[in-house]
Amino acid sequence: MVKERIDTGGKVFGPYSPGVKANGIIWLAGQIAPEAGGIREQTQASLDKIDALLAAAGVSKHEVTFAQVLLNDISDFTDMNEIYGAWLDGVEIPPARAAFEAAALPGGAAVEIVIQAYDDKCCA
């Protein structure tokens, strides 16, 4: 098995990889963007980071199989969901997803998004 670090050079806050790819499975660490503004802006900025990491792994949002969305305040769900849904526009099969409230997120973020994807070119 080959294990590969996925990185776009962004800042990390601890001993972890922004993403890891092994045997065609891609895991992205939770993406946050507390500097971006409100929930809508933070959601979009987090998804932009996810797009960049997926591209670094050689895939796109079309290969995302699971998303986990953590919200500092569950009342932000509707705004987050609108931005998230627009991001998925054109994706034939949307990923499975879980979304829930977390008491506190790193850096004072309002939203954190964790992604799992696959690379079907890997192991054919």
Stretches found by the model and what they are:
Residues 1-65, 71-124:
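N-terminal presequence-like segments and the immediate start of the first folded domain
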